[in-house]
Swiss-Prot record:
Broad class of enzyme this protein falls into: transferase
Location of region: Ribokinase: 1-318
Subunit-level organization: Homodimer.
Protein's name according to its UniProt entry: Bifunctional protein HldE
Active site: 264
Organism for this UniProt entry: Salmonella enteritidis PT4 (strain P125109)
């Protein structure tokens, strides 16, 4: 199965928020200053990049979507540099110039890939009349599919409720990257995207995923939100929606060099994907993949369609990830030529929880490659009832494929994967639960081929059914 990128070229997004210019001075450090105990940096490279709301717009435009940027600037060199740089990447700027204030600028001095100091040049824009911003939003609502409010608490978003109201009346979703602990000002937004520390500053410290989900659902109810996405660094992302199971997505970052601007990338990709007509779950998947790319770069950065496609399909392109049966057979044949032991398991994996992750990690340790066969939606419905699955097949496979322990993911339509297993003939077939080996679908075929069959225990206290019951109970309160 292939995962296609959204039709970004059809997506229109307006970004309103705190615009700033990020300046970078680079150079070697070879001595300590005689004037003070500080390093001397011999600057040999200077870079200027759009930051804050401007970086969000850059991320949207870099995907090929139509990005419009509205914000407050001064009348100075920094504003002109921003306009020039953004125009070069097809961001349509409509700044409100405030002659009494400088454009917000942040200067970073770096040496040997280390940031030595940051200098901020700014005066807050609080007190500036927001009406020109409202007028620009109104003018664009008929031609955009999403509105992003990028809040860095610098004064551009003092009238958030008016902006949310304008967009919601026009049927345009509002995505907000929040700042501070006053979430009341974001009431009625479609989606908030706090990082974990921002979330816990409002909801309180969470000792477990269950507690995070419970407190997140309370925030959704308290502030009339449609959804909440908590970005959790190395723990990935968690999407919460009323009356839906939580969607936990593991991180896809391979190496982390700099998290500067990663939140801008996440909300930019979310908005562009939604504006292209995709679901929120799909938008989170692409945003998670993009975040994994951008943290591997230094400074505020963007993600191109090619980079995003490689991140999404990278494992499949190299013989791993979500696959068709034919692709899987070829991948297994190649693995066997390399002398690798192939392990296979199967299940619905509707709401991925810690028990699933632990079970799959243990299964992977038994061999060199792990195949996970997943029941289709129709198969799940026959097996679990009309209310299942909670998450459709493509989303279940995407999440499984993102796990480090899983090499290949494939689906099957039948009630059991017996036919699929007979075609693959893994070296080891494993199943979790209270089964006897001879009761496991495909066991006879695997044994006949000289393979092994094994039963693994699930982690106690983890159950998809219990999670669903808890969500239903909480929603009825």
């Amino acid at each position: 199965m292939k995962v296609n990128l959204p039709a970004f070229e059809r997506a229109g997004v307006m970004v309103v928020g705190d615009v700033m210019l990020d300046r970078y001075w680079y150079g070697p450090t070879c001595r300590i200053s005689p004037e003070a105990p500080v390093p001397v940096v011999k600057v040999n490279t200077v870079e200027e990049r759009p930051g804050g709301a401007a970086n969000v717009a850059m991320n949207i435009a870099s995907l090929g979507a139509n990005a419009r940027l509205v914000g407050l600037t001064g009348i100075d060199d920094a504003a002109r540099a921003l306009s020039k740089t953004l125009a070069e990447v097809n961001v349509k700027c409509d700044f409100v110039s405030v002659p009494t204030h400088p454009t917000i600028t942040k200067l970073r001095v770096l040496s040997r890939n280390q940031q030595l100091i940051r200098l901020d040049f700014e005066e807050g824009f609080e007190g500036v009349d927001p009406q020109p911003l409202h007028e620009r939003i109104n003018q664009a609502l008929g031609s955009i599919g999403a509105l992003v409010l990028s809040d860095y608490a610098k004064g551009a978003l003092t009238s958030v409720q008016t902006m949310i109201s304008l967009a919601r009346q026009a049927g345009v979703p509002v995505l907000i990257d929040p700042k501070g602990t006053d979430f009341e000002r974001y009431r009625g937004a479609t989606l908030l995207t706090p990082n974990l520390s921002e979330f816990e500053a409002v909801a309180g410290k969470c000792k477990s995923e269950d507690e995070l989900v419970e407190r997140g659902m309370k925030l959704i109810a308290d502030y009339d939100l449609s959804a909440l996405l908590v970005t959790r660094s190395e723990q990935g992302m968690t999407l919460l929606q009323p009356n839906k199971a939580p969607l936990h997505m593991p991180t896809q970052a391979q190496e982390v060099y700099d998290v500067t601007g990663a939140g801008d990338t996440v909300i930019g990709v979310l908005a562009a994907t939604l504006a292209a007509g995709n679901t929120l779950e799909e938008a989170c998947y692409f945003a998670n993949a993009a975040a994994g790319v951008v943290v591997g770069k230094l400074g505020t950065s963007t993600v191109s369609p090619i980079e995003l496609e490689n991140a999404v399909r990278g494992r499949a392109d190299t013989g791993f990830g979500v696959m068709t049966e034919e692709e899987l057979r070829q991948a297994v044949a190649s693995a066997r030529k390399r002398g690798e032991k192939v392990v296979m398991t199967n299940g619905v994996f509707d709401i991925l929880h810690a028990g699933h992750v632990s079970y799959l990690a243990n299964a992977r340790k038994l061999g060199d490659r792990l195949i996970v066969a997943v029941n289709s939606d129709a198969s799940t419905k026959r097996l679990k009832g009309d209310s299942r699955p909670v998450n459709p097949l493509e989303q279940r496979m995407i999440v499984l494929g993102a796990l480090e322990s899983v090499d290949w993911v494939v689906s099957f339509e039948e009630d059991t994967p017996q036919r699929l297993i007979a075609g693959i003939l893994p070296d080891l077939l494993v199943k979790g639960g209270d089964y006897k080996p001879e009761e496991i679908a495909g066991s006879e075929e695997v044994w006949a081929n000289g393979g092994e069959v094994m039963v693994l225990n699930f982690e106690d206290g983890c159950s998809t059914t219990n999670i669903i019951k808890k969500i239903q109970t909480e929603s009825e309160k």
